[in-house]
Structure formats: C-alpha cells, structure tokens
Amino acid sequence: MKTLYSLRRFYPVETLFNGTLALAGRDQETTGFAWWAGNARLINLSGKLLGAHVAHAGLIVFWAGAMNLFEVAHFVPEKPMYEQGLILLPHLATLGWGVGPGGEVIDTFPYFVSGVLHLISSAVLGFGGIYHALLGPETLEESFPFFGYVWKDRNKMTTILGIHLILLGVGAFLLVFKALYFGGVYDTWAPGGGDVRKITNLTLSPSVIFGYLLKSPFGGEGWIVSVDDLEDIIGGHVWLGFICILGGIWHILTKPFAWARRAFVWSGEAYLSYSLGALSIFGFIACCFVWFNNTAYPSEFYGPTGPEASQAQAFTFLVRDQRLGANVGSAQGPTGLGKYLMRSPTGEVIFGGETMRFWDLRAPWLEPLRGPNGLDLSRLKKDIQPWQERRSAEYMTHAPLGSLNSVGGVATEINAVNYVSPRSWLATSHFVLGFFLFVGHLWHAGRARAAAAGFEKGIDRDFEPVLSMTPLN
C-alpha cells in the first residue's frame, strides 16, 4: 500500500534500546515503532491490524465464556448471588434468565448455555484473529477495497463510524426485543418483591426520556442514574436504537462538512484518542449506575446499594423496637431529633438517625410504606409484610463496604465477615478503568495533535544517554 505520509516524521519518538532487534520483519526502521509498541507497528497494515482486533475480541469473549462457566460451577442456588462473588451471573439474571419470583434462581441451565456459546464464539474469533495476523493479506485495500481504508480518508472513516453506530443500535434493540417478546426481564419493582415480566407499556415520550438528560446530577435528581422503572429503561433503549441506526445511515451516506474537517484531527491515533475518551465517559457513568441504581442493577443479584443498606438498618430496628413497645412516631434520639422517624427540611417523614442523609433512597421493599408525605406512620404500624422485614435484615448485613482482601463490613467492625459486594467491585473497577482510559485519551490526543501540527514533544532521542551504552545482550 502506498503510504500517504512519512512515518518517520509522524512517529519519531519511539526508539529501541537495541536497534538490531526486529520482530517478524516489522522493525523500527520501517514502522517508526519498536517491538514493545505492539499494534502501533500495524498502523498502516490494515489486514494485520484486523487480525489483532479480531484476536483481541476472541480473548474478551473467551474470558466471558470461561468466567461464566466458572461462576456456574461454583454457584450455590441457596445463597444470594451477591454473597458468592459473582459478577456475570447477576447480569444474566437481570435479563430474566433462570430466575423466578423474588429473584430466586430456579434454573442454572441458561447460564451454562451462555458460557458455552461464548466459548464457541471465542474459538471462531481466535481462529479469525490468527488467520488475519499470520496468513491473511497484510493490507486489505487492494484485494478487498470495501474493508480497506486509509486513516486520512475522511469519507471512509465516517462510513466506518456509521457501521459501528448501526451495530450499537441493533444491540440496543436486542434488549428491547428480549424485554418485549422473549420472556421479559427481571423487574425488582414487581409486586411482592420482584419477578420476571414482559415490559408491555413502554415509555416513548421524548419529554420523559430526554428529561433524564436535563436533570441535575446531584442528590434527589441524579441525572440518568435516577431511572427507577423498567418502562423508562426499555423505552430509552428504543430511542437509543433508532438514534444510533439513523445516525449510522447518515454517516454512511454523507461526507464530513467543512467545519468537521477543520475541527478534527484525521489520523489513526486521533481516532484512538476519541474512542478512549468515549469509553472513559462510559466507565464513569457505569460506575455511578451500578453504585446507586437498584432498578437496572437489582439488589436481589448485586446486593443493596450503600443508601439502601443504611435505610434497611434503620427499618430493621424500627420493626424490632416497635414490637417491643416503642412508640416509633415520637421516640427521641440522642441528638433531640426523632430516633426512628423525623421530618426532612421539606416536611417529608424520613428515617431518623445517621441514615437521614440517605432520605431520597427508593427501594421496592420500602416504597409500599410511603404515603403522600413520606413514610406513613399508620402503614409502618399495620402494613409491614414479612418479606419486607426479611429483605431489609438481609440488606442491612450486606452493605457494599469492603476491602481488597475480601474482609467486608465497616472498617471499625471487629467481627468482620468474608464478604465484598459486587457493587463495590463493579463500581470501583469501572471508575479505575474509566480514569486510566481518560489518561490514555489525553496521551494519545496530545500525540495526535502534535503529529498533525508537524512537531513532536518528547526527549530528543538522538542524544539520549542510553544510546551510547553497551547493548544488554
């Protein structure tokens, strides 16, 4: 393939400590990158880069399948999922597979099928990755022009963007079809403590769906993370699916406008930086979603949220002391505020004590006890159901607190338990990965902009001390 620009001009900073080492004929002299820079050597070899990406997809899908089967093999149906360190089975259960009323697992076979399907898929992807990395054409432009590309070809790049958007839209609709037609999904808000149901009455009103985007991200509002019914979640996926597919068709049929051609840097590294920036945002949003949202991430599978565990503790002791004769409506706590119940500044009746800061929690085990002005005293006295007591006691003792060595509970607790909530793991991992992706975004954006401007920040490698030293080997 004809190289459109000098690699040496664009990528002058990477150097080998030992210039004689070449790997598979792709040495630093011809690519501008040393062996350890991995796929950077394949920037202009579209066929080999395809192999690297397909092989990477194979590794991802292999992990999903293997980890899925590992979790199935270790799964004990009598214990809650969140007590067993599972992170994949809760996702499958949320999609309505293998669970019944109250989130009880009634069939693990769908989980086994999921693991096997992913393993088989990974074998296909692995073969494709090895084929394109080792045997297939180095570049696709000559033999398969539809799959070939040049990074500077703005029209081709937006066509590829369009194809990706259409695939994302199809993915959004897969969830919609599962919820509407193929067995439904798990709804933690179903009466009596959650159940799998088909979502029939979708929310398609743009004012509701896009209203989430206009909300404040702070307490009581919570931006899109505040979504608390499945009709809105599935309806939102209908909107997303249509937007992605229509946007994809638009990008395939059009060329970038002049303002876009001027505004963006059009190089492989620039596209990498845009992608890393987007993934970083996804990571931060996912972190907040799994930490605070108990509708998309039902507490039956992921364990309670932090606020939920705290409110569950207040509720559990209210139930106990009320049975022992306490008047929970008027009992005073050590601070002079209500011991069990108090009023918020806006007048709602909320739980008293330290958990007052989590007054805006909504959870399916608690909402039936609310009236028009917050918690309803008469319902608390007469209407508490056994399943609500059991669930709050369970959630009280499974707060999403814990350390890396799997010792759960409050840091000052002497009777520590071997429990860390999947919410802790998933929120922390997505925050950390989101942060690293953001750093990668800044790094590659800076390099891409510098290269486009015709200069490169970095050490002047011609006079680097290590070049005058004896090679290690």
Curated annotation (Swiss-Prot):
Pfam family, one: PSII
Topology of the protein relative to the lipid bilayer: Multi-pass membrane protein
Positions contributing to [CaMn4O5] cluster binding: E367
GO molecular function: chlorophyll binding; electron transporter, transferring electrons within the cyclic electron transport pathway of photosynthesis activity; metal ion binding
Residues where Phosphothreonine is found: T15
Residues excised as propeptide: 1-14
One GO location term (cellular component): chloroplast thylakoid membrane
Cofactor mode of binding and number, as noted: Binds multiple chlorophylls and provides some of the ligands for the Ca-4Mn-5O cluster of the oxygen-evolving complex. It may also provide a ligand for a Cl- that is required for oxygen evolution. PSII binds additional chlorophylls, carotenoids and specific lipids.
Modification type N-acetylthreonine: residues: T15
Keywords of the record: Acetylation, Chlorophyll, Chloroplast, Chromophore, Manganese, Membrane, Metal-binding, Phosphoprotein, Photosynthesis, Photosystem II, Plastid, Thylakoid, Transmembrane, Transmembrane helix
Domain of life, source organism: Eukaryota
InterPro entries per record: PS_antenna-like (IPR000932), PS_II_antenna-like_sf (IPR036001), PSII_PsbC (IPR005869), PSII_PsbC_sf (IPR044900)
The family this protein is said to belong to: Belongs to the PsbB/PsbC family. PsbC subfamily.
Assembly with partners or alone: PSII is composed of 1 copy each of membrane proteins PsbA, PsbB, PsbC, PsbD, PsbE, PsbF, PsbH, PsbI, PsbJ, PsbK, PsbL, PsbM, PsbT, PsbX, PsbY, PsbZ, Psb30/Ycf12, at least 3 peripheral proteins of the oxygen-evolving complex and a large number of cofactors. It forms dimeric complexes.
Protein name, per record: Photosystem II CP43 reaction center protein
Organism: Amborella trichopoda
